[in-house]
Amino acid sequence: KYDKVTAQRQPGSTFKLFVYSEAMNQGLAPCDKRRDEFISMQVPDKKTGIIRTWIPRNANGNYSGDSITLKAGFARSVNTIAVRLGQEMGIKNIIRTAQEMGIKSPLENEPSLALGSSDVNLLELVNAYCTVANDGEHCDPVVVTKIVDQRGNEVYVAPHTNKQVLPYQTAFFMQQLLKGGLTEPGGTSRSLNQYIFKDTDWGGKTGTSNNHSDAWFMAVSPKLVVGAWVG
């Protein structure tokens, strides 16, 4: 049977969480700026090894040419900035950070990974976003927390595997970036802000794969992370 929770799909821009997390790990801050401009790269084809030109494009097909903050770049899901950060921070470092945050699927060491080109599943993606909500502390997902008998005796307690994998500052910065998706001008999930109670603390990230085959939304609050996939 096809299990949509564990099925492998391209995460699209939801993967930018790991690109920006590694950027924060390496000392950048949401107020730092990068330019949204044309990029052309020579990349070997995975199957043939032939060198091809890869030109990452934004969703609207345009490059503003503006130098914008990372907070705005994340909120607007600007592809060129994510690709540039991927090259600056190192794809191998981004892979390591993604794995530490909860991604178990194999990830390709290629520039397009910054845009979510490698398949992951919904369960591990939600788990990784939980790491940000949990102030940088990762915990493996657990279905059964404990089992008690009819007398109330605990016959099984799930082991705790909590581990601090992100510095608190990185997690805090990423929480602010996720909020920006709902609040920043041009934020890809800003339209949802009208449906959220003003006293609640929510953030979110959208994602779309090539040809719009997959659409994702990750909603994050301090106590709850929800992932949705349509495709």
Predicted segments, located by residue:
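Mid-domain, small-residue-enriched loop/turn segments at the edges of structured enzyme/sensor domains
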Residues: 48-58, 89-127, 141-143
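Short active-site loop at a secondary-structure junction
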Residues: 1-18, 31-36, 112
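Secondary-structure transition/capping motifs at alpha-helix termini
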Residues: 24-32, 104-106, 134-139
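Extracytoplasmic/periplasmic beta-strand context in beta-sandwich domains
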Residues: 32, 37, 111-113, 142-145, ...
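Conserved catalytic neighborhood of penicillin-recognizing serine enzymes
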Residues: 28-94, 138, 149-179
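Glycine- and acidic
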Residues: 1-6, 79-81, 106-113, 159-160
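A penicillin-recognizing enzyme superfamily signal
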Residues: 1-4, 15, 72, 76, ...
